[in-house]
Amino acid sequence: MSMNKFFQPKNALKRAEDLEAVGKPNLALETLHDLLNSSKHKKQWTAVHEEIMIKFLDLCMQLKRAPEAKDGLYQFKIVTGTSAVNSLEKVVRYYLKTAEDKVAEAWQQSQLRDATNVNDEIDDLEEAQTPEQVLLAAVSADGETERANRVQLMPWLRYLWEAYRAVLELLRHHSKMEHAYHATARQAMRFCHQYERRNEFRRLCNMLSLHLNQWRTPYQSKSGQAGIDINNPQTIQYSLDTRFELISYAGKLEQWQEAFRAMEEVTGLLDSAPEKPSPPVWGIYYHKLAQIFWRSKDYAFHAAAWHQMFDNAIRNAKSFNRDDIQYAASAVLLASLTVPLANLDTMVKPMEGYLPEVRASRQQRLAGLLGLSRMPSRDELLQYMFDLNVMTYVHPALKDLYNLVEDEFDPLQLSQKAAPVLEFLKSHEQFAQYVTPLKYILLLRLLKQLSQLYSSLKLERCFKLASFMTPEECEEVLVHAVQDKVLQLRIDHARGSLHFNNNIFAFNERQVNDGPKLQNLQAEMMNGQLTTLSRRLYTAINMIKPAVVQESQMGVKAINRIKDEVAREHVSNLSRRDEIEKQKEELEQSRRRRHQEQMQKHHQNQMQVRQKMAEAVKKNQEELERQKLQLQREEIERQKALEALNDVSSSSAGQKVVQALNKSDLGTKITAQDIHKMAYEQQKKDARERQERLRAEEKRLDHMERAKRLREIPRRKEHIAAMSEQNAKWHTELQSARLEKARVDHAKALGLKELLKAFAPDKDAYIEEKTAERRKEYMAKLDDFKQRMQEQKIRLEREERERKREEKRRAEEEEQRRIKQEEEDRKQREREAKREQERQEQLKLEEAERKKMEEATKLQRQREEQVRAREQEKLSNLSAQTSQPTWKRSARSDAPTTAAPSSMRVSSWKGDASDDSGRSQPFRPSRGGERDSGRSFSGLGDRGDRAPRDTGRSFSGLGDRGDRAPRDTGRSFSGLGDRAPRDFSGRSEPSRSGPRDFSGRSEAGRTSGERRALHVPSGGADKPSGDNVWRSSRGAGSERRVNIPSRGDDKN
């Protein structure tokens, strides 16, 4: 939407309010944004601009449009300039206050307000959420409430952070808004601390550092406004206060690297200050330095910072009270005493992991912050402490601490004497940090003193003497002290003892201040034994023969003088030779240097000549190029001027300009801008002339109207007088007519009243009668209504009882259905379990039967093998005998036949061999003679004139089996061996299609037809029907079939 139609800013504001009222905040925001960007309304600030800006910021906050808000603030800064700084400050404060209120409201509504790990939700407010984070949030275990809180709170946190950044960038070069800039920086620090935004705090520190570096460079805006002057004392004080606040919040957020950088900036500000900072400023500076050094475990620099602070407090006692001085003195004492004797791992490893060069550079930087040239030692700090007379100002409870640690030799009572001091330190929060390092120092002093009294000591007693530390801490300190060569001892855990090493060959301890000594150790005395002996012998000789000693001394002195003179002359000769060589080298070097200088000078001259020639050529080319460009620019300007002349000639003012111009000056003296300017001036001139003409016409008309009015005044007065007289006459006549009419009406009413008085009793009686009837009807209706209400109440109560009874019945039926369903489910599960159990039992039975069949098959095969062996034996016995036929077929005798002997006749039911003479045949029916079956049972003779039917097997035990392999049916039909009985005891007959059970029938009860029908037919025989087939398992995957015809089917 174009803003050209808004000639006044208040119209745009009203339009935006109307759009917001109808639910179109986006259009309202665009309206105000276009107005702020319009150059037409940036010339002069008005109060309406402030209202527009506040409404604009409200819309940006409603829509969470931080970039638009930032751009609007920049445009408003241009509008305000230097004349309305208070308005800009008011708008900025309103913007930040509203954003902070929104965040606080979202924080209160969010259920994450009790958590301090908001940083775990979104690590960086400036980074967009990645697809991986979106997917992870979708599948995370957070509930809907946590996700809703995150969505509700985090956008406002991001918006507030963007607001802080925008305001700081806006005010960084505004000298009149410097106090607002630093106030905003402190607000941003509180925001980072309140919501645990560590990443944003680091960005804030980088931003403030960048702005400070930019202030060191002179800056001037496009409008001519000067930037912030870093040399201004007020600016320095603002910056120092902001940095000190930054260091405090950095400590709370554990951002000590940022605190150290801020401290370096503070050092630079103090050094560059034109005026000397006040003593309280130095006190704050040294106190912050001491905190940083303690956190970085630079205990020596920490103590040095407290020394500097105490010195500042003493030299400026008027600026500090007595409690501050006492606190500083106590801190100096504790910091100096707790400086480690060595870099024990359990105490401090400040330089671990640093290269020597880096370590030296770091120490130099830290010393520079305190104005020192190097890192002070522990002894120097203690000596400086006495130079400052610190012990006079320390707390009374700490006055004996120095003597306890450095002077007294009482190892057995050291723990008891140190206990009150340690308790005092623990009870005061400002001194509690010194408890642990002080324990380490006390333990080392205790062990040093014990090493002078004992060569070995029980660990239990040692731990008891060091009761201010746990045994584990004591042992850890011992190990690291031996590792760093502070102590000479060893721990024997097997015997639970501590051995102090007094061996003369042991390593030398570090040269540290050992504190009080009772006597030197044996190792120390042995190390200096020869020196002591020499000194004492010299003293004895001097006492016995002083003259000899003096002569000896004089001789020694003369020899020493001669040696010194010889050495001096030798050195002089060597130096003279070296001097000659040095002079030769200097002469040679001077000659070479002069030659090189001449060559360099010649080369430089040539280079200068070439450079001058190149510059001249380049200058000529540039001049030609400049002239060419000038001609091109003039031609372009001339074309633009002609186009502008054509544009403006369409108006009357433009035509006047065209007539007044000299076209030869186009493009040189007169440009297109000049033409437009002249046309604009001519338009303004014409407009002024029109205004003058209009004003003259207005003046003429005013005079004419005034003259007319003056001539009309007398006539208007006469007309008014005549109208007044006529109106009075009309009023009198109307009043008289109204009164006469009222008198007549009153008389008529009185007559009517007298006439109606006779009807008054009848009227009263009629009213009473109607009233009684209406009352009676009302009472009847009331009784009827009460009766109907009572009946309805009874009916409702009855319906309620029925409803409750129906609900109860439905509940009981539902409960019965549920119980019945549960019972049916239980029975169904029992039936299924029973069927499963029966199926398992059936499987077990079938498995057992299969195993029995396999065993029977195996036994049958063994018996068949035995039968074959016996057949072979009988065959060998009968091979020499001559066979005689015993029976033949009666019809045909073409081929000789032989009858089987009685001893080898085969039963048609089973394959048992029987003797006709000695045994009856219970399974064979009694017959008069042998039945011709068409085949021979003799295995020794010919088969007769009729070929036996090929059934795929042989029934003779002596002949060949034919051209087909016998079919294994699980039984033997040979008459020479025993038969393996089949086991049918375990089979049942559930249906006609299953196997039949023969276990209930005896062999004698079977008919001959049944016995003959149990043979196994060949593959070419007719297949038996399904009901008469008996299947049995002979092995894995095998099957045999036996046709069992009915009793009437025996025809063969």
Curated annotation (Swiss-Prot):
Residues 570-606, 793-1052 are annotated as: Disordered. Disulfide bonds: none annotated. It comes from the Eukaryota. GO terms for biological process: formation of cytoplasmic translation initiation complex; translation reinitiation. It is found in: Cytoplasm. InterPro entries: EIF3A, eIF3a_PCI_TPR-like, PCI_dom. It comes from Monosiga brevicollis (Choanoflagellate). Residues 568-712, 769-882 form a coiled coil. Component of the eukaryotic translation initiation factor 3 (eIF-3) complex. GO terms for molecular function: mRNA binding; translation initiation factor activity. Keywords: Coiled coil, Cytoplasm, Initiation factor, Protein biosynthesis, RNA-binding. Residues 325-505 form the PCI domain. One of its GO terms (cellular component) is eukaryotic translation initiation factor 3 complex, eIF3m. This is Eukaryotic translation initiation factor 3 subunit A.
